[in-house]
Amino acid sequence: STPMSQKLFVHLKDPNDSEKLIALKKVASEHPGQEELILVLGEAAQKTALRMPFKVAIKDELTTALHEFFDPTAVAIK
């Protein structure tokens, strides 16, 4: 049986932070794979989840690269 595929969630508190959005796309493009990348925008009640059009390979290299731009608490694998 194949395990349920995981999803990578990246939380961006400020939806207007284009620098982080660009960084996210760059990192994702460097780690292509089969898993979905979900971008969570905003805070608390105002959160919006967007499924990114590209898929990634959820590996340590990917999360490490993301941690350079995002707080570790902003990156989750579920």
What are these regions (language model features)?
Residues 1-78:
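Primarily single-stranded nucleic-acid-binding OB-fold modules
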